[in-house]
């Protein structure tokens, strides 16, 4: 993960802590974002619905449960 994404993830964790999300949610959302960052190669400022839709499709094809996919989408919603 590059420095920009690492900094963004650190700031996101602080945001979640300030909003008093549970420790479990903070860990889960952080892992979800790391996965998204790994699978989506475009710069953060250029992430669009298309990349998120492809990410969801790939998660579904990989056999992820809809509850997991929806949690990952929720993490992305809070991040962006």
What positions do the PLM features span?
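A detector for short, charged/polar N-terminal pre-domain segments
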Residues: 1-6
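N-terminal core-binding DNA-recognition domain of tyrosine recombinases/integrases
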Residues: 10-80
């Amino acid at each position: 993960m590059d420095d920009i994404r690492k900094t963004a993830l650190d700031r996101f964790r602080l945001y979640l802590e300030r909003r008093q999300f549970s420790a479990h949610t903070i860990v889960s959302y952080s892992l979800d974002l790391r996965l998204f960052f790994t699978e989506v190669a475009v710069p953060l400022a250029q992430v669009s619905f298309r990349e998120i839709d492809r990410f969801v499709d790939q998660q579904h094809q990989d056999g992820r449960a809809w509850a997991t996919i929806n949690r990952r989408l929720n993490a992305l919603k809070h991040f962006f």
